[in-house]
């Protein structure tokens, strides 16, 4: 491969990596803060779970806390593309799909025991 072509190829590889890393950091900046549940659906219908009792707090340093109606946990998180990976202290990693993330809303798509669930949270 001629040197000029190699340089051009490397340029596009690095430009792509920078673009992906900027998107991930933009999304992480949107995620940081306090979130409260607004709606919890199972198979597109009300789940019977009280979404207002769900709270998350994501810190810029990769730490998080959550409260599911009194069941509290804390740990670390990684946001990668459209997936949020949380690892509660002393437990295994959990992954949820981030269907939507804006400055004021966060939507998780989850699968519990084969049942599709959607949890919508609003930034506090």
Feature locations, PLM:
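Sec-dependent bacterial lipoprotein signal peptides
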Residues: 1-21
